[in-house]
Amino acid sequence: MSVKPSWGPGPSEGVTAVPTSDLGEIHNWTELLDLFNHTLSECHVELSQSTKRVVLFALYLAMFVVGLVENLLVICVNWRGSGRAGLMNLYILNMAIADLGIVLSLPVWMLEVTLDYTWLWGSFSCRFTHYFYFVNMYSSIFFLVCLSVDRYVTLTSASPSWQRYQHRVRRAMCAGIWVLSAIIPLPEVVHIQLVEGPEPMCLFMAPFETYSTWALAVALSTTILGFLLPFPLITVFNVLTACRLRQPGQPKSRRHCLLLCAYVAVFVMCWLPYHVTLLLLTLHGTHISLHCHLVHLLYFFYDVIDCFSMLHCVINPILYNFLSPHFRGRLLNAVVHYLPKDQTKAGTCASSSSCSTQHSIIITKGDSQPAAAAPHPEPSLSFQAHHLLPNTSPISPTQPLTPS
């Protein structure tokens, strides 16, 4: 969550669009706000802001408590087993760290929405909190893409070099994702400022003369990097993996194929509504013209859509960890480890393989070394069930500037 999309020259709450000819006489934000103050409403939508704040407060609080517990458990269990980490554990561990970062930012967004976007935590935290959120949002999505690609490559690759260097590749990919995610938000964050007033607000404040261009560039980059590029990759590689695993007449195979399709469906349900709303509000007034009732509804429900997009940090631990019997075994071992010694025997695993934390869909090669006579050995597959969902709260569009 962050600053809401700017209405630019379009209508905000109870305000009509201003003719373009009138905007030619406007030279700064103060004059623009003054013009909107004297513009009459053409339509009015009766919506309860107080009810929305209560609902959002409850949702944010629930996501914070559940997400904090889930992601801490995932990190602890995977960290303890990092020495003998499974096929996808490095990506899962990093994704849990990114999701935990989003969860830790939820109290700030919860209070900001409750206080009607009044920012009480100073100028530094205004920028840092948004930057911290964006970094973790992009990281979570990118690690999800890597999981989808790596799963298919591991399933289909018989190359000895891949078997030898796959862990190095994964470490390099994880480091690269964190660096890339730290760079991507910078153009937006440098324009986020604390606007002082009776009720200080944390807003996206690009130069007035190029504000519409900046707002559109930020919205497009968010949608492209956060959805339009990850979505095809996640879809294609999960579908290819499902086709590879499909075995007619095998109920377990069908279940795992449906699970792979569920990964894609959850990602779409989390992020598509957010990015559609973000683009519509950003384009309105400058590139497209929306009916004022629709604009009112989009602004009103933007906070709710933004909140639901953050559900990925609560659902990811369930889909990629808790639905896996292997993870539950490791979690039980971790709990038993801290119990009195005379109670630990009942919780120990029969073998190390049964305790290893793996992705809900586990892909292993039949032989560690490819046979000379069989350059393309058939993979041996074992599965555990689970679901998916991506990030972020989303990168919020620029907030409508409504006078106090």
Curated annotation (Swiss-Prot):
Keywords: Cell membrane, Disulfide bond, G-protein coupled receptor, Glycoprotein, Membrane, Receptor, Transducer, Transmembrane, Transmembrane helix. InterPro entries: G10D_rcpt, GPCR_Rhodpsn, GPCR_Rhodpsn_7TM, GPER1-like. One of its GO terms (cellular component) is plasma membrane. The chain crosses the membrane at residues 58-79, 91-113, 128-149, 171-193, 218-239, 259-280, 300-320. One of its GO terms (biological process) is cell surface receptor signaling pathway. Highly expressed in heart, skeletal muscle, immune system, adrenal gland and liver. SUPFAM superfamilies: Family A G protein-coupled receptor-like. Disulfide bonds join C126-C202. Glycans are attached at N28, N37. GO terms for molecular function: G protein-coupled receptor activity; transmembrane signaling receptor activity. It comes from the Eukaryota. Residues 80-90, 150-170, 240-258, 321-404 are cytoplasmic. It is a multi-pass membrane protein. Residues 1-57, 114-127, 194-217, 281-299 are extracellular. It is found in: Cell membrane. Pfam families: 7tm_1. Orphan receptor. Belongs to the G-protein coupled receptor 1 family. This is G-protein coupled receptor 182. It comes from Homo sapiens. The gene is GPR182.
